[in-house]
Regions:
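Short hydrophobic transmembrane-like helices used for membrane targeting/insertion
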Residues: 1-2, 11, 23, 41-42, ...
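N-terminal amphipathic/hydrophobic targeting modules at extreme N-termini
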Residues: 6-17, 22-26, 34-36
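PRPP-dependent phosphoribosyltransferase catalytic core
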Residues: 38, 43-61, 186-231
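Active-site-facing substrate-recognition patch
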Residues: 43-110
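Solvent-exposed alpha-helices and their adjacent loops that cap or buttress functional pockets
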Residues: 76, 160-164, 191, 211-212
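Short helix-loop-beta connector
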Residues: 109-113, 163-165
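Short, glycine/charge-rich flexible loops or terminal/linker lids adjacent to PRPP-binding catalytic cores
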Residues: 126-169, 176-182
Length: 231
């Protein structure tokens, strides 16, 4: 078999037609420019997450799976005709990534590098945000605030990377009285952190927002009772 050898023009023509550059071919500036242009075209077709679609789908899932109708007693002691069980959402394989991305977008204007809250409601929310940040090529640490300090080991109340001297976000799935996020915020401040805000997935409109304001904490939420069809 006789192999036909190509000159520089032939090699360039074959490469530009879509094949790999020939072995031994020295890349010129124009070649590099062509390669970068192709890379830009390819990456432009990699769709970024559509936050509006994420939010809409998350709302759909919350309405379908998390709202329980019937008489229930809330943590405040008051009775309600419904209950929003968001752990069915934050621990769900489809919904959790949506929670992470939507909560990140909700707090995108805030400066913080760690997120956490009082166990248990805050834990999956914070972890979802950690994974959403990692998927975006960013780092976000998570911390867990125990309901009481350990009586053994290091006897620490906050688990995870140190938050001393750091700006942190307190999260919760939902809050009725605001007690859990406030307790977590106090623990974080005692550990040397600066709390930038409190953020939840759903606001029940039962006074938590007012409690946060009294404590000097900014507060934001993804969904209101109107969004959930409960008001």
């Amino acid at each position: 078999m006789i192999e036909k050898r190509l000159g520089p023009q032939g090699m360039a023509k074959r490469w530009k037609s879509g094949s790999e550059p020939p072995v031994g071919h020295t890349l010129r500036g124009s070649d590099l420019g062509t390669g970068l242009a192709r890379l830009a075209v390819v990456t432009s077709h990699i769709a970024a997450p559509d936050i509006d679609a994420d939010r809409a789908r998350l709302l759909e899932i919350v309405k379908d799976r998390a709202i329980v109708h019937g008489k229930v007693t809330l943590s405040s002691g008051k009775e309600a005709d419904y209950y929003v069980e968001l752990r069915r959402i934050t621990l769900d394989g489809e919904a959790a990534p949506l929670v992470g991305r939507v909560m990140r977008e909700l707090t995108d204007d805030l400066e913080f590098d760690a997120v956490g809250g009082l166990t248990l409601g805050a834990d999956p929310v914070a972890t979802a945000m950690l994974h959403a940040a990692a998927a975006a090529g960013e780092r976000l640490d998570v911390f867990v605030v125990r309901k009481a300090g350990k009586a053994h080991g290091l006897q620490q109340r906050i688990e995870g990377p140190s938050i001393r001297g750091r700006r942190v976000l307190i999260v919760e799935d939902t809050s009725t009285t605001g007690a859990s996020p406030l307790e977590a915020a106090t623990a974080a401040q005692e550990a040397g952190a600066t709390v930038v805000a409190v953020a939840t997935i759903a606001d029940r409109a039962t006074g938590a927002g007012e409690k946060f304001a009294e404590a000097g904490l900014a507060y934001r939420h993804v969904f209101s009772l109107i969004d959930l069809g409960l008001a």
